[in-house]
A protein has these predicted regions:
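HotDog/MaoC-like acyl-thioester-processing domains
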Residues: 3-18, 96, 100-154
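Hot-dog-fold acyl-thioester-processing enzymes
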Residues: 2-90, 153
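Conserved interaction-surface patches within small, structured recognition/assembly domains
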Residues: 92-94
């Protein structure tokens, strides 16, 4: 079932196959969200002040990459909706090739690259995914590889 686009309510490791693809709903990023996140977690001028940000290399306000990562996580979790939750084992190759700006609509595309039973936790399996976050113009704003521990059906 390579390239199958799945929509299900609750997923277990047993439901997942290499090549399965998932796409999230859209998420609108607002100026208020960008500034509030930056004030708490990444207080750089191009995340905090519209006027000052216009004088930077970005020529305007942009979201922190970490804010983009947090939005990606939210959309990923909502879309895959793992039964009992999934435990993140790590992220590799995290990239932010284009900035996220106020008003952008983000969507996450996830593809399962590998699946295998866990050797140490027999009631779980390990999946490897590629997550790509795009804006409304189809521009890639974040990519990453992720691994997660997912429960099997009992």
């Amino acid at each position: 079932m390579q390239g199958v686009l799945l929509k299900m309510s609750e997923r277990y490791f047993d439901d997942l196959k290499v090549g399965y693809q998932f796409q999230s709903e859209l998420f609108e990023v607002t100026e208020k969200q960008i500034i509030e996140f930056a004030e708490k977690f990444d207080p750089q001028i191009f995340h905090l002040h519209r006027e000052t940000a216009e004088q930077t290399i970005f020529k305007g306000l942009i979201a922190s990459g970490w804010h983009t990562a947090a939005i990606t996580m939210r959309l990923f979790v909502q879309t895959l909706n793992f039964a009992e939750g999934a435990i993140g084992l790590g992220v590799d190759e995290l990239r932010w090739p284009n900035p996220v700006r106020p008003g952008d609509l983000l969507r996450v595309e996830s593809e399962i690259l590998r699946v295998r039973p866990s050797r140490s936790k027999p009631h779980h399996g390990i999946i490897r995914l590629r997550n790509t976050t795009r804006n409304q113009r189809g521009e890639v704003v974040q990519t990453m590889m992720a691994s997660a521990l997912v429960p099997k059906r009992k």
